Amino acid sequence: MFSKDIGIDLGTANTLVYMRGKGIIIREPSVVAVDVKMDRVRYVGQEAKDVIGRTPGSIVAVRPLKDGVIADFDMTTSMLQEFIRKALKGRAFAGSRVRVIICIPSGVTAVERRAVKEATQNAGAKRVSIIEEPMAAAIGAGLPVADPTGSMIVDIGGGTSEVAVISLGGIVTSRSCLLYTSDAADEARSV
């Protein structure tokens, strides 16, 4: 039995996986390619993105997250399972003590929060902790989140953008919006 600590930034456009002592070890698109005839996942992440348009019509690309939350529970679970497997370098992780801390947008509903936790557990994590994205971004940026001073963080993601003020170890206020995201910016540039 061994224990692995993994941090996951589950994003609409990309998913990042961090492993304690190694840093960010996976940075891949949040895409799953599914063989609809066989009803099974064929490719995940960069592999799935690379095969878009190069496969028979029976293989369809799916983005399992929309606007920062789970849109397809089963596909999200499959994607997380593959990313955890890659993080552990293919070793079987059944019986291992994989502990995952995973980010969620601020302001998600209790149902959306529970869906993320359950998808992560179904993917093989034995223990799941949830942190709001602005807090994770502030900690990652080295901001003094525990100090009695306000720190503002702006996190522009693929599906949601968030602004938060953090002080004394908590989020004082936050707003999440869908108006300006990297997906929206890419779409505007292509017009």
Model-derived segments and spans:
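Nucleotide/phosphate-binding catalytic cleft detector across ATP-hydrolyzing
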Residues: M1-G158, A164-S182, R189-S190
